[in-house]
Amino acid sequence: YKRVANPLNGVGRVLLVHRTKGLLTRLNSMKNHTKLCHGDYCPDNIIVTADAKGNIKEITAVDWVHATQGNASADIANTFLLLKLQFGDKSDIPEKYINAFCELTNTKRSYVNEWLPLVAAARLTKNKEEEKELLEQWINVVDFQ
């Protein structure tokens, strides 16, 4: 048994507890849905079949291991975040994706945005150092458009 010093002492611990409570309060206030959610819908899990001219014939989502029943807006927010992590600000793909979903489903963008801190916090648990800064920004955002 070896005792390890807790790096979350003092102010850091208070801030973490406050942020966690805020995220849990937000999560508990979100509507429950029964939609099929992929859980990891990103370019790596999409197979596009095209003809010789490059016309799309079929789009198939693969890797359904993270599939759940839940709120589709949470799944969309997660995909948006994955696209932002992959493409950063050098592509408009994340914005086009989330805007298309909102338009096709008559969902307010602000509602999908409410999920961003929650999915960012979930992603942060994967401990990928290269993602930490962006995820922290999404978690700390309070007001959305």
Mark where each language-model region is.
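Catalytic activation segment of kinase domains across protein kinase-like and atypical kinase folds
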Residues: 44-76
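Alpha-helix N-cap/helix-start and coil->helix boundary motif
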Residues: 9, 13, 43, 66, ...
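Short, structured helix-loop boundary elements
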Residues: 13-17, 73, 91, 95
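Helix-rich C-terminal or lid/interface subdomains of diverse kinases
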Residues: 69, 77-145
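A general structural-boundary detector
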Residues: 28, 63-67, 111
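An alpha-helical support segment within catalytic cores of ATP-dependent transferases
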Residues: 1-39, 47-52, 56-60, 142
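Short histidine/acidic/glycine/proline-rich micro-motifs that form metal-
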Residues: 4-7, 66-67, 86-87
